[in-house]
């Protein structure tokens, strides 16, 4: 038994087709489909109401993550699948994800298949975010923020307090599962050009993603963030100190302050790590 949660905001052009495809592909399973209309101003709700699915409507736009959490809270089953309502994810790939659902805590549809339509201007930022996430989480993550994945309600609800209400929901849940030792399986899928206009703001959302990655890793593994900063400051301070002492014969306040700051940040990281381990 599986509950499929579809967060939707102004997706009138694609949501009907997505729901129809889900009903067809899931006919051999016991399932429910929950569409969470996140305050759409178009005919999204009207289109969904004509289908044999459950619809929940937010009174106004709260966010992608908030819509997913609403769907999870109202799901009848422990096994949850999320998929976007814009037609960009291949519904026909769902059976492949379900095949391994009993063996992993989360199965992610990784957009690394043979046909992947990601806009060119988004690829450098996506690559940078992936490299940052891979380093901080010490894990190879093929797709950090795929919107097609399966997980269990009892597991994800443990992290509701740190899962954001915006687009960064998927990024956070990926990092959270990896840094807490849960098993994640990536299944390659295709990814198509979405129907309608994207709601992502490249610059603002990109900066938010960076902050989110650092914050999430700090929450679970603070030394991974604090220690590199401490080492860099110490090395810079030491280099300046040696330069001033050897060549200028006069040591200013800057290198001393940098070295002191390095030790302070390092000890702060150690303290944060002790707190995390006692949780």
Model-derived segments and spans:
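A conserved acidic beta->alpha catalytic loop
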Residues: 37-45, 87
């Amino acid at each position: 038994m599986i509950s499929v949660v579809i967060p939707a905001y102004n997706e009138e052009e694609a949501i009907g087709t997505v729901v129809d495809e889900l009903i067809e592909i899931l006919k051999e399973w016991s399932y429910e489909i929950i569409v969470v209309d996140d305050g759409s101003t178009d005919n999204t709700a009207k289109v969904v109401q004509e289908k044999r699915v459950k619809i929940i409507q937010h009174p106004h736009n709260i966010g992608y993550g908030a819509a997913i959490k609403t769907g999870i809270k109202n799901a009848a089953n422990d096994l949850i699948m999320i998929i976007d309502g814009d037609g960009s994810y291949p519904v026909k790939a769902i059976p492949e994800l379900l095949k391994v659902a009993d063996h992993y805590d989360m199965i992610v549809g990784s957009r690394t298949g043979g046909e992947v339509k990601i806009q060119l201007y988004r690829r450098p930022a996506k690559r940078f975010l992936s490299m940052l996430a891979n380093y901080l989480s010490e894990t190879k993550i093929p797709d950090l923020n795929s919107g097609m994945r399966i997980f269990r309600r009892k597991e994800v609800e443990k992290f509701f307090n740190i899962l954001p209400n915006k687009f960064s929901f998927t990024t956070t849940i990926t990092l959270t599962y990896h840094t807490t030792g849960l098993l994640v399986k990536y299944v390659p899928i295709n990814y198509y050009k979405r129907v309608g206009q994207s709601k992502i703001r490249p610059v603002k959302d990109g900066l938010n993603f960076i902050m989110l990655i650092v914050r999430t890793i700090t929450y679970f593994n603070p030394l991974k963030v604090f220690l590199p900063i401490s080492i860099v400051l110490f090395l810079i301070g030491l280099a300046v100190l040696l330069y001033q002492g050897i060549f200028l014969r006069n040591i200013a306040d800057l290198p001393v302050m940098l070295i002191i700051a390095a030790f302070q940040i390092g000890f702060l990281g150690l303290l944060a790590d002790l707190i995390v381990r006692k949780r």
